[in-house]
Amino acid sequence: DEKFSITHVGLMNSDRNPTILWEVLNEISNTNLNFKNDLRIKLIGKLDDAVIQDLKVFDHNTIETIPYLDHKDVGKYQASSQILLLSINEVPSAKGIITGKIFEYLQAKRPILAIGPEDGDAAMILKNTNAGTIVGFKNKTALKATILNLYKDYKDYKEGVLFVKSVNIEQYHRKNITSQLAEVIKKVVS
């Protein structure tokens, strides 16, 4: 994407609605016209009514919603997006949540911006792979700084695409995970 695109793929229900992100993006947009003009939020998948309501603060041309996209086409959106948004459910068990989405995002090799527990399992994966940043559910200051740093990188990198120097992502490829699961099942059965 030529724009500063932030893309989320999949269901975004009420406990996965990153209200803090919408607030921060709106604050930055209201004080930085270049950011406002560059920002694109792409949401692919079913959205809770609360999410739709929260997004009304943005200009119509800032938001792109696609209710359904065939899985084979999702990869194109992920690979072309500047940033992939991973929003962990804000629930008591959030530290242990690892969505399947994180593994698909890793394969896209785009920067991941996650909102969730900074000491959770998803945070550990992002740290081990150098594939992105996780910001706590209520850490508005860190989220704003992260977005502004990503935006600065986007503006500085004139070829138009942000990239990550991820490492060790092969261990999270679905073939490897399936193989590891098969080994566990074999051990349990025998």
Indicate where each model-derived feature is located.
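Acidic donor-binding loop of glycosyltransferase active sites
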Residues: H60-E64, Q78-K95
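Short hydrophobic signal-anchor/transmembrane segments that target glycosyltransferases
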Residues: T19-F35
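Conserved donor-binding/catalytic core segment of Leloir-type glycosyltransferases
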Residues: D1-R16, W22-L25, I177
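A charged, aromatic-enriched C-terminal amphipathic alpha-helix characteristic of glycosyltransferases
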Residues: K138-A142, K155, E159-K187
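Short hydrophobic beta-strand element within catalytic cores of glycosyltransferases
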Residues: I83-S87, E104-G116
